[in-house]
């Protein structure tokens, strides 16, 4: 909608008043879209954003679960291979 982060938070809170799940889903979809917008390639943005708009889909975030809990990793490409660094 082109609004500010504060206004986005207000929309999330308003949705959550009626349904915490709806508020969380809305927020997480927008977080995923923002990550793609900031870091995705042009081709990936075209593919995902057109799917969201044309098919009314939602974006999502996924985390790996190694061992006994959810772990957050940052990936980087070096020496022709993907590498993961634990950040939490």
Swiss-Prot record:
Residues 1-22 form the signal peptide. GO terms for molecular function: flavin adenine dinucleotide binding; oxidoreductase activity, acting on the CH-CH group of donors. The keyword Transport does not apply. It comes from the Bacteria. Gene3D superfamilies: Acyl-CoA dehydrogenase/oxidase, N-terminal domain (1.10.540.10). Keywords: Signal. Coiled coil: none annotated. SUPFAM superfamilies: Acyl-CoA dehydrogenase NM domain-like. This is Uncharacterized protein HI_0082.
